[in-house]
Amino acid sequence: MLKVEKLQKSFDGFMAVADANLEVSKGEVVAVIGPNGAGKTTLFHLITGQVSPDSGHIFFKGQDIAGLAPYQICRKGICRSYQVVNIFKRMTVFENVQVALMSFLKMTLNVMTPARKLLIKETLDILESVGLAEKSNQISGSLSHGDQKVLEIAIALGNRPELLILDEPTAGMSPEETAMALGLMNRLSGKLGLTILFCEHDMELVFSIAERIMVMQLGKTLIQSTPDLVKSCRQVQEAYLGGGYLTDA
Amino acid sequence: MPDQKIDVQKIFWVMGIGLLFLLLPRFLPRFYVYLTALILLTGLLATSLNLVLGFGGMYQFHHAVFYGVGAYSLALMLTKSGLPVWTGFIAAPLISAIVGYIIGLICVRLSKLYFGMLQISLGSLVWAIVFRWYSFTGGDDGIHGIPLPKILSVSHGAYYFTLIITAISLYLMFRIVHSPFGRTFQAIRDNPERCEAIGIHVRRHQLAGEVIAGFFAGIAGTLFVTVEASVFPDLMFWTLSLEILIMCLLGGWFTFFGPMLGAAIMVILRTFVGIYTEYWTLILGIVLMLLIFFMPDGVLGMIQKAGGRGDGVKGNHRL
């Protein structure tokens, strides 16, 4: 479904992504791991168009989407959440998701229908599926950090994505919230059959949910394989996991 | 779930205020009726600015251009063309909207302050043309004694026309603010980057906002011609843009009716303080300073907060 080939991006001479290669098949859950500064977030920015690549290809369903604008990529079916909470803080939880749905249904240039009457059921369905339905009338900026991260995902679901990209979905979450987020990701990939690509520092979470793992270091892809093979890969252990860690896990 | 109830109290308020304005000429001297018309059309202008400023988060620094273009378009059509009178009233806002489109097309490529700076320079260009082109626009003299349709020049015709058109325009803008477009626009104000990521073509929406705001500013311009029967280049000078910007801030730029209130305060201040001193801007400066320190949300914003309507989060439009 998604294929990244020899992707490169440098900022003012700093090679953020030097040679990234990645493959995600339909229905799969793929994790990207790597130390801080390995280029994971930049890779996601490249895929979703926030940053355009210097060279390389990004194929989505056989089509090269490298360099397209973010809104175009979103309309092709790739949606994302952000590492740092990135929501519409002055709007209610309901409105946050509703706007995404309006965008998906191309209603955003409609100037005459009252918005409060639109897409109520669809919006509540999404909020229900992530467990935020009771908080739908709250101003999103007043939610707890964990809820805001979940709302991130809910907004991304508004565009009915085929590929959902989550940038550190549990960053800054408490252990309970992390467990809930893990449950949510399981539901999204199981029940809704979403393809999920995510990066994460919580190794326990990564190895419990990812079907394949891609390891990045200094902007390069070291390996992409199944969790077991990644665990046993010496290169990975030396580069990132400091040896030993995974054999204990 | 959003509030689905029809607010009866609100309807009574709107009807009461409407009735008050309708009966105003019966018990107010002519000058005050004129002043009210001026407040209404200035309020309309400020509200149209707030559409992009408060709801769209765009730094619309030279909004008066669209007002001036509307006024001049009507004035020129009435004095220089043989077209039926009412076509001018329809064409003028459309011309403003077109100018909004052209200026917007260039400006939305930039963001925030740069957007505003570019707009000031493009707007000043339009002003300079009008100011200098004596043979066509009358230059710095402007155009005076514009022949208006009879219905507008008799008794309180201009006032009622202004009142009706302002009410309709406000209603339409209110609908727009609460439409999917309006909601998207507010989302863009809060977080343009995220909007792009959920498939919204931010620039296109900003451009659409610019056209809509230009259109309504153009309507305000035609109303000015109706009330004053004259136009002059000051209508599109940048100081006027600043004034209406202050009206939005003063009334509360995160509320829908705030700019209307701000316009009322400013017009009244200018008129009455202006009688005693020509340094009325001095008073304005003091008002502004007090505003920034004590009422950052504007008058209406503060009233709403005090009344418990505000949710404690700035900019959650409820009125």
Where on the chain are the PLM-derived regions?
Chain A
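Glycine-rich phosphate-binding loops of nucleotide-dependent enzymes
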Residues: 1-249
